[in-house]
Amino acid sequence: MAKDIKFNIDARDELKKGVDELANAVKVTLGPKGRNVIIEKKFGAPHITKDGVTVAKEVELADAFQNTGAQLVKSVASKTGDDAGDGTTTATVLAQSIVGVGLKNVTAGANPMDLKRGIDKAVAKVVESIKSQAEMVGDNYDKIEQVAAVSANNDPTIGKLIADAMRKVSKDGVITIEEAKGTDTTIGVVEGMQFDRGYLSAYFVTDTEKMECVMEHPYILIYDKKISNLKDFLPILEPAVQSGRPLLVIAEDVDSEALTTLVVNRLRSQLKICAVKAPGFGDRRKAMLEDIAVLTGGIVISEEKGLKLEQATLEMLGTCDKVTVSKDNTTIVNGAGAKENIQERINQIKAEIKNTTSDYDKEKLQERLAKLSGGVAVLYVGAASEVEMKEKKDRVDDALCATRAAIEEGIVPGGGVAYIRASEALEGLKGDNEDETTGIEIIKRAIEEPLRQIVANAGKEGAVVVQKVREGKGDFGYNARTDVYENLHAAGVVDPAKVTRVALENAASIAGMFLTTECVIVEKKEDKPEMPMGAPGMGGMGGMM
């Protein structure tokens, strides 16, 4: 396949055109007065969104050189979204500014490597300042609500929903987003630990109306192999039955012979018993059984530990306040495990989350963490039309991610003010040479850009507002939603520090690569010959009877 190659200023100019095309489409969504972008879909209604990364993902340019530039900035937006969950539009605006001003200087003869060094120096200083401005959220759910509301494009109802969901399942809990059947947005909470395995036989059901097996204060037997013959099972079954308490059996599987015996006993002697399969597969199954054991204060009966089923005693069984088993799910509420053991297990899973690189593993570990630390909340997003539903779901997702980032690294004043305050840290900062100092000035100018854009989207003059905010101190800034200058912290206009930091770091990283690019290679478009026309005279079959 033949390639097209461009060098120096030609290459950089084409890349910049692509950057501008993408950034101009994305930046109109920034801030409380951000505009909508309508995206045509091949099938169904067009998608209306204010989510920067959704817009960025849709941009594909016809010119290969320009498209390369656009794709690079798209990667800034995506990476910021992945790392911090929000701030995609801010990162795009910052990248556009650094690239734009930087290229002017490179064209005027500045050394790109020195510019990059200056940019990196300035970014390090700004990041330091952002960290020092950050205020930890702790257990203050009012602040959590503010962050969520701002990220959901200033929708206080979404902010309240997310804060309520976090109250119910703790900050470590898993919160998932699903589409509601009606127009209302509501929260559903599954308390305790739930896993997706139901009863092995419908004869275990105690509540025939709901088709559920409900047990109060049951013993819980956790076994990591298949229960195939009853002989091994009887030594633990008999004392459990004599105690008069129900018994929940969690095992890899229960053979038909053993299952039949359990069912017959259940029906004849009203033996309160239920058997379910263990959740998960392979190593994940072992880990989940261990989680259940820690939560209920029991032990996993496993031959790996030198324990056989016939050696099991009542002391090895877990217990809890209540178990509900349906056709598809088992829920364990208020396990009797020791608090410190559960906390230790939670810390262990958190450490695994930090160390894993796979998104899939991270998601699964996060689920396990939630099940141990309080439960799972589901936000059911409702809207009047499918188009509105998609747009609202985007915003709820943004808000949820931003809230998690705020819990991690704290909050800073929103509305681009954190960057303006951070620029004070650049006063008097000099590079080792003139070009490095220019690099520092590029960042100083770029970090004003988010505020300028927020103001421009609100229909005001950016330069005037930036000057006024710069004259203020601390949390003083411009609230674009209400069009007043005030203490943004008090007004609830706050951003997660992590989002602010990650957006700048990623933007500067890609922009630095741009400035030091000397050659771009793309695939040459081949002109395909047009399809030949059909043979003449085939238009009709005239004259045939």
From Swiss-Prot:
CC per GO annotation: cytoplasm
Domain of life from the UniProt record: Bacteria
E.C. number: 5.6.1.7
Keyword S-adenosyl-L-methionine: no
Lineage: Bacteria, Pseudomonadati, Bacteroidota, Bacteroidia, Bacteroidales
Its biological purpose: Together with its co-chaperonin GroES, plays an essential role in assisting protein folding. The GroEL-GroES system forms a nano-cage that allows encapsulation of the non-native substrate proteins and provides a physical environment optimized to promote and accelerate protein folding.
Compartmental location: Cytoplasm
Database matches in PROSITE patterns: CHAPERONINS_CPN60
Name of the protein in question: Chaperonin GroEL
Stated family: Belongs to the chaperonin (HSP60) family.
Subunit structure: Forms a cylinder of 14 subunits composed of two heptameric rings stacked back-to-back. Interacts with the co-chaperonin GroES.
InterPro entries registered for this protein in UniProt: Chaperonin_Cpn60_CS, Cpn60/GroEL, Cpn60/GroEL/TCP-1, GroEL-like_apical_dom_sf, GROEL-like_equatorial_sf, TCP-1-like_intermed_sf
Primary localisation category: cytoplasm
Catalytic activity: ATP + H2O + a folded polypeptide = ADP + phosphate + an unfolded polypeptide
Keywords: ATP-binding, Chaperone, Cytoplasm, Isomerase, Nucleotide-binding
A GO molecular-function descriptor: ATP-dependent protein folding chaperone
GO biological process: protein refolding
Nucleotide-binding recorded as keyword: yes
Binding site for ATP: 29-32, 50, 86-90, 415, 495
Signal sequence coordinates: none
Organism: Phocaeicola vulgatus (strain ATCC 8482 / DSM 1447 / JCM 5826 / CCUG 4940 / NBRC 14291 / NCTC 11154) (Bacteroides vulgatus)
